[in-house]
Amino acid sequence: MVKLWRRYKPFINAGIQELITYRVNFILYRIGDVMGAFVAFYLWKAVFDSSQESLIQGFSMADITLYIIMSFVTNLLTRSDSSFMIGEEVKDGSIIMRLLRPVHFAASYLFTELGSKWLIFISVGLPFLSVIVLIKILSGQGILEVLGLTVLYLFSLTLAYLINFFFNICFGFSAFVFKNLWGSNLLKTSIVAFMSGSLIPLAFFPKIVSEILSFLPFSSLIYTPVMIIVGKYDASQILKALLLQFFWLIVMVGLSQLIWKRVQSFITIQGG
């Protein structure tokens, strides 16, 4: 364990330093995310104001507001830029430096991201989550229930990030074949945002569509952890959702290993 820590600590430090160095860029992107959350809030407010019902698909306006907030936080903590990093490093040729290091290829990206994720969690995720927990307790929910859901949310959040990371690693490996992933990365991000429930809760889709999307790995990224913290899942649904997350994590890890063995023969160094 000590040897592993010493080997990957520089990557963790690099992730932290990168976030600190480009903090203005990070803040500007987050402002854009917050503006998007406000747009979503007012769209849903208009929907509820025009509806005769106080509940739509089991959601009240308060539930939707909490969903929007936690979707923003969860997206921030589970997103992975590994496919973008691989694509850029393949394009400019710097991928050779990573390949020459005596470390696991995917793990080097993982620990770099973990460095930045830890900083984001402390500075953004924890304050938001603390406020949500406090509001839930003050609204009359039992302390043990709220704390239990929070722990389950954090566990689900961890699984969600790992699924997303290895999915992006798999996608990023295609850069060794196609050489440029800029356009396809943007398309991938948009599709995943839609299918993960980040924009619209999957419960609002037609039943058959909702069931299909709920089984796919993308629902595990945003929808599952957010539904847990919002309190829309009972104990059996939480267990089922967590088992599905475990399943997709195993699939993504296995798939990443398989694809990596296949694409190594396509490695060519560009740039100079």
Where is each model-derived feature located?
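Hydrophobic transmembrane alpha-helices and immediately adjacent juxtamembrane helices
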Residues: 1-272
